[in-house]
Amino acid sequence: MSLKTKDTDVSADLLIVQGLSIAYGSAAVVHDVSFSVAKGESLALIGESGSGKSTIAKAVLRLLPHGEASATGRVALNGTDILTLPEKQFRPLRGRELGFIPQDPASALNPVRTIGAQAHEAAALLGETDPAVRRTKILDILEQVGLPDPARVYDSYPHQLSGGMLQRVLIALTVLPRPALIVADEPTSALDVTVQKLILDMLTDLRRELDISLLLITHDLAIAAERADSLVVLKDGAVQESGASRDVFAAPTTEYARSLQADVPALHPDRYRNQRVTLKAAHDGGSRTAAALPPAVGRQIDVQGVTKHFSAGGKEVLAVDGVSFSVERGRTHALVGESGSGKTTAVRLLLGLEQPDGGDITVAGQSTSGRSRADVREIRRHLQLVYQNPFTSLDPTWRVGRIVREPLDQFGVGTKAERSQRVRETLEAVGLPADVASRRPAHLSGGQRQRVAIARALVVRPDVVVLDEPTSALDVSVQAGILELLSKMQRELGLTYLFVSHDLALVRQVADTVSVLRRGQVVEDGPVEDIFHRPQHPYTRALLDAIPLATPSVPAKHEDDETASKQLAKASS
């Protein structure tokens, strides 16, 4: 990738963006952006929310809202400026020359039409009129993207397929007409890590086999560096840095690009655990490694042999099968697993939202088995939850002060004045200004909303906090700020965390111990360092293998790759 001038030979470039500026009314959102994508090349636009990357992609696809957005500059596909092209002339380019893979496969497909019926629309772009020939081509491409039983998928409706299968379908429909360029907008952000790896591997293979160029939109620098030949780093609608992926990733020259690199979990595996160690060492007047920390005393959570069945479609489903784990006081234990692993059910059992069919759960030394609702409610005072998505977990009609105060009201803590004072103190502790208390969630950023959620959990001064994917909905730098805050709160308050995640790279940064769940069972558990350096189970190795590369020049391979690859294939089905 290189930035081109008007006098430069651009014969090898498929897509040229020159001086692109975009505004919504009087608000400019993209400022003089230029880049090019060569034939057969992959280029990633990387940036956080508000960086302008998706807006640029919409301009390339001619999907900017008509009458609301204005674009100036040049966007040339095979030498033709598509910004000035009449719609009648641009329409034939859609699908044939320019393909699009959206972020959410479930919303991109028509829920009341079969996959086959929708695939025939893509096949029609090939100019083939015979339905039988079209069907053959569709089944061939469904098989090529690795979907088991293409004929069944062809006859299925979207709701009958998993997220990973739906994304494969979208990729199949996109590549079927053999476009010259594919724009992929965060194509794996909603998928489990092993499925993400499979999808990206498949997209890379197809691109190379069919000589298709790729414009990848992502917020993840590690994925961009691993999958793209070139990078363009965006912030506030302007290019901060651009160049070969390896160069930008290994030695970023701008402060913003360096901050994105610093927030890649795989590059700093001990980031937050070391903070706890450093503080302990400072108090002791010496330095210690993580392994040298004194042993924790007392279990705050003890789960032994817990099972839980659910009825689904007339069948009994064993969601949790003999799960056991414990969390020591002041430590962080992680439950790791993908969709359907049982980790969410385990958390609901721990919180008393579901009752186990067997086994025992103890929180802060008190067994939850056979207790009255009032007793369980009192136990819940010691155990608070931070939800996954701060955009849906906070009541949009309430002001922040009331949201944070609600647990105090529920448990009857203190007088009204004392509650208000504790709310102010807790908001200050999580790094929010006092005036936030009078605002509603809609007026806060994603990071601020999650700080409010953390404040709500901490205001009753619990012993244990369950963190359910607490950063998965956030940009990487915002994620880093939240993890810094959680680490600080743990150091200062002696909190015990149960960290629920599907991302082992993130888990390595924050957890002391980990349990890996698959299909309702713990397949491996132990200290984080042991799990990372000496994984015993093929599924654990598959999760490790799915972590985006720490350095793009050195493949992140693990032992027994063949077994791990087979496990990855199973995880996607």
Q: What spans do the regions from the language model cover?
A:
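ABC ATPase "signature
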Residues: 239-243, 251, 522-526
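Conserved ABC ATPase "signature" region
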Residues: 81, 133-152, 418-435, 544-545
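Conserved ABC ATPase signature
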Residues: 156-161, 165, 440-444, 448
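ABC ATPase NBD coupling module
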Residues: 82-99, 117, 125, 247-252, ...
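Conserved catalytic motifs of ABC-family nucleotide-binding domains
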Residues: 178, 461
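Helix-to-loop junction immediately C-terminal to a conserved catalytic motif
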Residues: 61, 65, 351
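Conserved ABC transporter NBD signature motif
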Residues: 69-81, 359-367, 379
